[in-house]
Amino acid sequence: PAELEKIKALATEQDVDQSVIKLMNIRGYANVRNMCIYTAYILGAEMAMLIDDDELFEKEDFVDLASQYIGGRLYGKTIDGVAGYYLNKYGNYYDDVDIEPWMTYWDRFGFKGKAFDKIIGQEPRIKLTPFAFGGAMIIHRNLFKTVPFDPNVTRGEDIDYLINAKMFGFHFFLDRELSIKHLPPKK
């Protein structure tokens, strides 16, 4: 909270509209992510790297990997965002869930696993992606200065951001080398 007040003071010094400053808070995932991209913006950074507090860097070159393609071009499109992906405690990208009887009828984790196999598990290394993970997103300045996270979205802010970016003509790619260990707390 003290750091947030400093950011608000800096925004006021830069004549940021008070209606925008009122939006600055750290309640909910979307607002926390907005504070991350806003901080990158006011610091003049070319990219924002969004990482969560329950993740571990296992690759020493993670930052180099994350910044390797951002802002470039591939397949005739700008690389405005790069999505990494989570590895669970077992070192794979599948959701670590206990199978419940209802999953027989609504196999969302099975379908998700198939999508991950297709996007994460296959070449090429960099490809356009239909999904992103909020705790493993790299966002170029051209994108984050135009598209914020929707503060009214309480969950799924990462996919919502991807959709909004696409609506504004920006492109998100997934880098199959950009993995990070995700160790969420026990519920």
Task: Annotate each PLM feature.
Residues 77-101:
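Short beta-strand-to-loop element that shapes/binds the nucleotide-sugar donor at the catalytic cleft/hinge
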Residues 118-138:
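A recurrent flexible, glycine/aromatic-enriched loop bordering the glycosyltransferase active site
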Residues 45-56:
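Short beta-strand-to-loop acidic/aromatic patch adjacent to the donor-nucleotide binding site
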Residues 154-161:
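Acidic donor-binding loop at a coil-to-helix junction in glycosyltransferase catalytic cores
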Residues 168-171, 175-187:
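Active-site donor/metal-binding and catalytic loop motifs
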Residues 142-145:
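Short, well-ordered alpha-helical scaffold segment located
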Residues 1-39, 43:
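Active-site-proximal specificity loops/subdomain of glycosyltransferases
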Residues 60-81:
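Conserved donor-nucleotide/metal-binding helix-loop-beta segment in metal-dependent transferases, i.e.
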